[in-house]
Amino acid sequence: GRQAIFRDPSWNGGDYYGGKKPEDGLGLARMIGHITYMSERLMHEKFGRRLQNADLFGFNFESEFMVESYLHHQGIKFVNRFDANSYLYITKAIDYFDLKADYGSLAAAFEKVTADFLIISYTSDWLYPSEQAREIVRALRACGKHVGYTEIESDTGHDTFLLDDRQTQRNIANFLRSQFEKHG
């Protein structure tokens, strides 16, 4: 995704304020990223190999498939509400972040934390797999922390938490209620 922004001539080394923004690069970065936000099953159900506005292949370079049109739409929406440099810094910060690095282990990183935790994962999330969530839960429990964990069976991928997901809402509401009862 970052390379798409870097290769946009309007990026200008990040100094595009006051000029044309690198909308093509940012839109393409969003399109690339968006593919990982949905599960394979949801992508297949929603789009499959269906064509957008035709019954037969056009054998050209236009956006023929529904998935192409959807991804273009997502890219256009994104550039209207997000800044390319912000995208670059956020994604780079995610790459650099390693909680274990400064502490030697996850358990050591959580040792001094006094808060209770609620960890929720989704079976179809490719970006934050359930196994990573379970690793965090094991580390929290290893250092005696109170942690609730729920793995939600879902076919909607990383975006599940953005959708109308009653199970996620219920888990968060119950956790917050318990925290209010505990702490007032």
What are the functions of these language-model segments?
Residues 1-77:
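Alpha/beta-hydrolase-fold enzymes
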Residues 73-74, 90-109:
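Active-site nucleophile elbow and catalytic-triad environment of alpha/beta-hydrolase enzymes
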Residues 102-107, 129-140:
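Short alpha-helix in the alpha/beta-hydrolase fold that links the catalytic acid
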Residues 110-114, 141-143:
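Short, conserved loop/helix-junction motifs that constitute active-site signature segments
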